[in-house]
Amino acid sequence: MGNSMKSTPAPAERPLPNPEGLDSDFLAVLSDYPSPDISPPIFRRGEKLRVISDEGGWWKAISLSTGRESYIPGICVARVYHGWLFEGLGRDKAEELLQLPDTKVGSFMIRESETKKGFYSLSVRHRQVKHYRIFRLPNNWYYISPRLTFQCLEDLVNHYSEVADGLCCVLTTPCLTQSTAAPAVRASSSPVTLRQKTVDWRRVSRLQEDPEGTENPLGVDESLFSYGLRESIASYLSLTSEDNTSFDRKKKSISLMYGGSKRKSSFFSSPPYFED
């Protein structure tokens, strides 16, 4: 028999690692891949990917929004657990994801702190992205403010999802929740038909000057309006002619109240929160 050569078998796909016994919910794309300078990206920043296999530094994954399947290097993604616990991204990437279009105020993530290893940080979208350090006690309980501790991160998230309690705002939705939301379908509305010349607004000023004027001062076909609507128009015109002094007094009182509230707040110290 002649010599024969065996083809080298393809490397078997390794099972996914299980940190703390949890499978990641999805991968979050941190930057467009491939780079737009090289070719049109297959996966874009902010996309959520479902893992197919771990190829040793590379992931085989499928996009949850486009359905495209391909490989992506591990440095371009972060693993996400519980929908809000991000593993493998820093402060800058967290801010980029939280500032993506359609990200709502209160969107948040928890990530490993860059400045304190073994600790976590809570990043929240507000007017700007705010970062709060999460401390861990020797008994493995967590806290942001020392006066309030939690047995696990999930309890911490649940609490601050109900009340801000010193944070910049209430936690609303995990980061990237909107990235796979189905686009809203606008219900088709029936066409609106307008009748010509319902109200001659050029004659309104004359009505204010001469309330005892003609029988139909607005030039309106009264059959087109109910009695209540005609009364509403008349009430509106009478209100617009009133003096605005009451509004000025109200505005001044509001400004005084606001000034008083600012002075009052100095007597109450907010709970100590440590920004990361």
UniProtKB/Swiss-Prot annotation:
The UniProt-reported impact of L224S is:
Abolishes interaction with CBL. Does not affect dimerization
Which tissues show it?
Answer: Expressed in lung and fetal brain. Weakly expressed in heart, adult brain, placenta, liver, skeletal muscle, kidney and pancreas.
What does induction of this protein depend on? Answer: By all-trans retinoic acid (ATRA). Induction is indirect and is mediated through other proteins.
Phosphoserine modification sites?
S253
GO terms for CC? Answer: COP9 signalosome; cytoplasm; cytosol; endosome; nucleoplasm; plasma membrane
Swiss-Prot/TrEMBL keywords: Cytoplasm, Endosome, Lipoprotein, Myristate, Phosphoprotein, SH2 domain, SH3 domain
- According to the entry, every stretch annotated as the SH2 domain falls at 84-175
Does Lipoprotein appear among the keywords? yes
Q: Which residues form the SH3 domain?
A: 22-82
Pfam families tied to this protein: SH2, SH3_1
Chain segments carrying region SLA C-terminal: 212-276
Question: Which GO molecular function entries does the Swiss-Prot or TrEMBL record give?
Answer: epidermal growth factor receptor binding; phosphotyrosine residue binding
| Record protein name field | Src-like-adapter
Tell me which species this is from. Answer: Homo sapiens (Human)
| UniProt lineage | Eukaryota, Metazoa, Chordata, Craniata, Vertebrata
The primary gene name is SLA
